[in-house]
């Protein structure tokens, strides 16, 4: 079994989901008392959020690259960045290590294509929805990507940082998300990517008839697969 290097804490709530899903998947795959071999480095999220807010991606990338190096030195066989947004600096991190990074957007694209999805809506932080680092991975895989209008982008992003990252789950915010999802459906989306590891804490598949692809679940299950097979 491979040792999984997790970079978590962005936020810690979603990182606990990674730990649980990876171990549940390993147990299902191998049975018995098997559990995942995991090294976890959990950051102080306030540092990362500050660098995001001021646009200092170089600094945040260096911080995570240093962590990835420590995980590699400690015996990790591959790296899992437990957040969508910070995959913006994945290339910078990869340059500093010799082990692979399991990219969350590539794992998600594979899951969509297996299910025959061609046009997909994307929800996430404003960085994930509007910048190319994430959407390009989806487009390169042959997917057409739709995002909310500017009002939707602002509200989706606000709820992530002001509520979900603080562990606050509000019914009013769920309804806001469901309205945005409905707009994406009307625009032709065949499914929606929950492209922030916190969104799955708020919106569940039973809340809508449009297929939802929770990147936390997809990424964590793929990490378990790599841990067993790669």
Residue ranges and their predicted role:
Residues 1-230:
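Non-catalytic structural scaffold of enzyme domains
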């Amino acid at each position: 079994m491979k040792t999984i290097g997790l970079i978590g804490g962005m936020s810690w709530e979603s990182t606990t989901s990674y730990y649980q899903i990876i171990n549940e998947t390993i147990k299902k795959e191998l049975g018995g008392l098997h559990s995942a071999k995991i090294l976890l480095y959990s950051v102080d999220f306030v540092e990362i959020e500050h660098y995001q807010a001021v646009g200092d991606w170089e600094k945040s990338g260096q911080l995570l690259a240093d962590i990835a190096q420590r995980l590699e030195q400690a015996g990790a066989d591959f790296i899992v960045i437990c957040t969508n947004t910070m995959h913006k600096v994945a290339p910078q991190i990869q340059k500093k290590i010799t082990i692979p990074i399991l990219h969350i957007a590539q794992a998600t694209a594979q899951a969509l294509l297996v299910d025959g999805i061609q046009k997909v809506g994307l929800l996430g932080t404003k960085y994930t929805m509007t910048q190319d680092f994430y959407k390009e991975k989806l487009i390169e895989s042959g997917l057409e990507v739709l995002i909310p209008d500017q009002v939707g982008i602002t509200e989706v992003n606000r709820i992530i940082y002001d509520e979900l990252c603080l562990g606050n789950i509000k019914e009013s915010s769920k309804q806001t998300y469901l309205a945005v999802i409905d707009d994406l459906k009307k625009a032709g989306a065949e499914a929606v990517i929950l492209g922030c590891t916190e969104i799955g804490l708020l919106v569940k598949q039973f809340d809508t008839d449009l297929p939802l692809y929770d990147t936390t679940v997809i990424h964590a299950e793929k990490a378990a697969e790599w841990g067993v097979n790669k």
